[in-house]
C-alpha cells in the first residue's frame, strides 16, 4: 500500500486504496464515496439481550462524509472566500513547490510550470463548486486539497484533487 503525504507538512493526504487518475502530469484525481459510520455501536453476533434487564445501550456517535476525508483525517477549510484569495494562496504554494522540485527533481520543474497553469485555469473556472481540505495539522502553508462532486453514472460522486508534486509517496 502507498500513502501520499504532503511534502511541506508531512500530513497524510490519501492512499492508493482509492481509484486514482493522474491529470496532465500534475493533479491526482482520487474518487471517493459518501459514507456514514457509527462509533461505539457494539453488536455481537448471536447475542440476545436479557428481557429482564433494561437495555442501557451505548453512546454511539455517527459521522458522515467523504471516505477519503474521514480515513485520512482531512479538515475542511473555509480560508478562501473568493477566487482572488485562492489565487494568492496558489501563487505562494507553487513557489514553494518549484523550490522543492529544483532541489529534488529539477527535470520536473518545466513539466510542473507548463501543465499547472493549464490545470489551474480549469480549476479556477469551477471555483464555486469546490470544497477545500487541509491535512490533519490544518496548516494552510501546506497542500490544500480540493473536492468537487461529479455526476458519475448518474450518481453524485466526490472527487478529491491533489497536486502530484506536493506529495511524498511512502510504501507500507
From Swiss-Prot:
Annotated keywords: Calcium, Cytoplasm
GO molecular function, one term: calcium ion binding
Cellular compartments annotated: Cytoplasm
GO cellular component labels: cytoplasm
TCTP domain residues: 1-172
Keyword S-adenosyl-L-methionine applies: no
Chief place of localization: cytoplasm
Function: Involved in calcium binding and microtubule stabilization.
Entry similarity comment: Belongs to the TCTP family.
This protein's name: Translationally-controlled tumor protein homolog
Amino acid at each position: 500500500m502507498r500513502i501520499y503525504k504532503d511534502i511541506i507538512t508531512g500530513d497524510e493526504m490519501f492512499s492508493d486504496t482509492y481509484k486514482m487518475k493522474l491529470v496532465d502530469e500534475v493533479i491526482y484525481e482520487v474518487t471517493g464515496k459518501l459514507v456514514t459510520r457509527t462509533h461505539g455501536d457494539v453488536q455481537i453476533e448471536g447475542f440476545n439481550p436479557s428481557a429482564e434487564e433494561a437495555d442501557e445501550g451505548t453512546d454511539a456517535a455517527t459521522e458522515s462524509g467523504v471516505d477519503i476525508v474521514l480515513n485520512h483525517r482531512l479538515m475542511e477549510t473555509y480560508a478562501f472566500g473568493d477566487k482572488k484569495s485562492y489565487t494568492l494562496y496558489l501563487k505562494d504554494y507553487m513557489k514553494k513547490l518549484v523550490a522543492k522540485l529544483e532541489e529534488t527533481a529539477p527535470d520536473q520543474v518545466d513539466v510542473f510550470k507548463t501543465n499547472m497553469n493549464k490545470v489551474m485555469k480549469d480549476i479556477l473556472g469551477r471555483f464555486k463548486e469546490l470544497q477545500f481540505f487541509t491535512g490533519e495539522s490544518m496548516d494552510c502553508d501546506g497542500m490544500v486539497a480540493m473536492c468537487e462532486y461529479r455526476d458519475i453514472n448518474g450518481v453524485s460522486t466526490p472527487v478529491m484533487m491533489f497536486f502530484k508534486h506536493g506529495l511524498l509517496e511512502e510504501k507500507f
